[in-house]
From Swiss-Prot:
It comes from Ruthia magnifica subsp. Calyptogena magnifica. Its main location: membrane. This is NADH-quinone oxidoreductase subunit H. NDH-1 is composed of 14 different subunits. Subunits NuoA, H, J, K, L, M, N constitute the membrane sector of the complex. Its EC number is 7.1.1.-. One of its GO terms (cellular component) is plasma membrane. GO terms for molecular function: NADH dehydrogenase activity; oxidoreductase activity, acting on NAD(P)H, quinone or similar compound as acceptor; quinone binding. The lineage of its organism: Bacteria, Pseudomonadati, Pseudomonadota, Gammaproteobacteria, Candidatus Pseudothioglobaceae. Pfam families: NADHdh (PF00146). It is a multi-pass membrane protein. Belongs to the complex I subunit 1 family.
Length: 357
């Protein structure tokens, strides 16, 4: 962080002919670039990791032709999508058809500005950062709904209707699950929530909130349209859903938005339930000093990688659920459990159950 502060000071020093506002805008643009480029690279190579991991799980090799051991496969995929023609359905609303992927990718990137990667590594530190994530993150589904309607095609419309109903169902569940974390931390600031979990793995929220952690993880799979809950796309039912009529870069943007949201949900699970950037060995003799050299951002990335692997593991293991089963899971199982657990956490907070409350 000291290096970043020195860089900011250098920008102000080297631009004396700018007023403070222009220099501040320049800093914001630099921050945006340093966020978006690594995020897009991670998304691109997560697709490679997904194909490799699932390939090994299914006793296949996975991509291994483009570059050494297939490392250049994401670049080849990007070039292919960039050179493919964008085909518009005959009776589609072209302007809304093109707006839909933008509306899907913009929130998927915008939410990252409040994610704390370490104690002092973040784009901005909002006091209401969790509310910001929930509010901005929920906008992306309107891109999917708009894509289904603007395509003027029956399968995309069915996918859009499913997406709308799942949004109503699981945004409530996720909100209630994360409300229990807020009750423990006493704040909706993500930095404060992570700081409340310092002291070692015993202080992490997943221990007192284990049912909420499981519900959040499953709901995250559903919200991001991941197998076995990918009924919005459902190739065997609605042949791709909202993506049926999209090709070329418009399809690629939807693809990037989906994977960016997957990584976001993995990071959010780590921040809310697994101590964020904190080491699991804090307050443990010998181990704490042995791993004291590891930066906090490395711990956060390691935990996030584990959750991203769980995404792939679940996809390769379970068959797709029916749409009615997923809706029943929300309203008849998850919602009652989260409401009950809110009262349980409230009671434990009043009793000041150590060491979490």
């Amino acid at each position: 962080m000291e290096l970043w502060q020195a860089f900011v000071q250098m920008v102000y020093t080297l631009t004396p002919w700018f007023d403070g506002t222009i220099a501040s805008i320049l800093i914001i643009l630099i921050k945006a670039i340093t966020l978006v480029i690594p995020l897009m690279l991670v998304v691109a190579y997560f697709t490679y990791a997904e194909r490799k991991v699932i390939g090994y799980m299914q006793l296949r090799i996975g991509p291994n032709r483009v570059g050494p051991k297939g490392w250049l496969q994401p670049i080849a995929d990007a070039l292919k999508l960039m050179t493919k023609e964008i085909i518009f359905p005959t009776k589609a609303n072209i302007y809304l058809f093109l707006l839909a992927p933008v509306l899907a990718i913009a929130p998927a990137i915008a939410v990252w500005v409040v994610i704390p990667f370490d104690e002092d590594i973040y784009i901005t530190n909002l006091d209401i950062s969790l509310l910001y994530v929930l509010a901005i993150g929920s906008i992306g589904v309107y891109g999917i709904i708009l894509a289904g309607w603007a395509s003027n095609s029956k399968y995309p419309l069915l996918g859009a209707l499913r997406s709308a109903s799942l949004l109503v169902s699981y945004e409530i569940v996720i909100g209630f699950a994360l409300a229990t974390v807020v009750m423990i931390a006493g704040s909706v600031n993500l930095n404060t929530i992570v700081q409340a979990q310092q002291g070692g793995i015993i202080y992490w929220n997943f221990i007192p909130l284990f049912p909420m952690m499981i519900i959040f993880f499953i709901s995250a799979l559903i919200e991001t349209n991941r197998a076995p809950f990918d009924v919005v796309e459902g190739e065997s039912e609605i042949v791709g859903g909202t993506h049926v009529e999209y090709s070329g870069m418009t399809f690629a943007v939807f693809f990037l938005a989906e994977y960016a949201n997957m990584i976001l949900m993995a990071v959010l699970a780590v921040v809310m339930f697994f101590g964020g950037w904190h080491s699991p060995f804090e307050a443990i003799p010998y181990l704490e000093s042995a791993f004291s050299w590891v930066p906090g951002i490395i711990w956060l990335l390691a935990k996030t990688t584990f959750f991203m692997f769980l995404y792939l593991w679940v996809r390769a293991t379970f068959p797709r659920f029916r749409y009615d089963q997923i809706m029943r899971l929300s309203w008849k199982v998850f919602l009652p459990i989260t409401i009950i657990w809110i009262f349980v956490v409230a009671l434990m907070t009043q009793l000041k159950l150590e060491p979490w409350f």
